[in-house]
């Protein structure tokens, strides 16, 4: 992932799997390693079922996180990592709306949307 200072950080997981449709594509991740200070934001999604705007599987009782945070994902209650939010340009990315955009909360917080990110499954 790249922030708006063009600083690059990374996170890697030794185990990543997505369950079958019958289990709503439940995510399982473990074995985190990453660049200094990045924090393991994706592990908060481990064990969660996939949520979309029309099919809510998150643990938030009052709302659908996929609607609130503008993108489908394996949400718990609040997104610690949300790569599918609406892309924000520089003027909107820092200090903008709470948890909107592309976030990796444990390093950048909820008011910072990343400039770039890439996710690979090998």
Predicted regions and their residues:
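Mature extracellular or lumenal effector domains of secreted proteins
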Residues: 1-122
